A protein has these predicted regions:
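Bacterial N-terminal signal peptides
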Residues: 12, 20-32
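N-terminal soluble domains immediately following signal/targeting peptides that reside
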Residues: 38-188
Length: 188
């Protein structure tokens, strides 16, 4: 009888350990697949900041570096090494600024397209940043009730489900709009 109990105990503990191991492996797989899936949800963030010190409108586009490299290869038809090649970074920066437009929407006046200057790009960790600026913006708009009309189609020609979040920071608060499927031009 003692042997049977020990054997039963052994079988139960072995099965429990196997189940626990399987659950650990399954949990790890679920966690890893969620992390990978989370990155598959293509999103870029653009920040528009009214800089009262310089009087300019600063535009900062943040894209996942991995997405930028894949998109650059698809758009330009050959592999682009954005990490190592300044030329590839500049080429992709040009792509970004050509898919972003902004206009001033002052009540009672026709839309006034703004012409941001391209300042450059840089890599910061897992992100590629692309910078633009509209100089002398604040001084020319003092006292006007205005909205910005924004077009942000960055990466949407590569991935139609691409989501582009635009955060506009002014007067101490942030307003956001999200460009997703079907949204071509939004006001903020």
């Amino acid at each position: 009888m003692r042997v049977a109990i020990s054997r039963t105990f052994f079988l139960r503990t072995t099965l429990a350990a196997k189940r626990a191991g399987l659950f650990s492996v399954a949990g790890l797989l679920i966690f890893c697949s969620a992390a990978v899936y989370g990155h598959q949800q293509k999103t870029a963030v653009t920040r528009l900041l009214f800089n009262s010190n310089t009087g300019s409108l600063e535009i900062m586009h943040r894209l996942f570096l991995h997405d930028a490299e894949h998109a650059a290869s698809a758009v330009f038809g050959e592999k682009q090494d954005i990490i190592e090649s300044p030329d590839s970074r500049a080429l992709f920066g040009s792509y970004v600024v050509n898919r972003f437009a902004i206009a001033l929407d002052v009540q009672g006046e026709p839309l006034q397209e703004l012409k941001p200057h391209y300042l450059g790009e840089e890599i910061d960790g897992q992100y590629l940043w692309v910078y633009q600026e509209v100089p002398n913006f604040a001084t020319s708009q003092v006292g006007k009730s205005l909205q910005l009309r924004v077009i942000n189609s960055v990466l949407r020609d590569v991935w139609p489900d691409q989501s582009n979040l635009v955060n506009v920071e002014r007067g101490g608060h942030v307003e956001s709009v999200t460009f997703s499927v079907g949204a071509d031009s939004l006001s903020v």
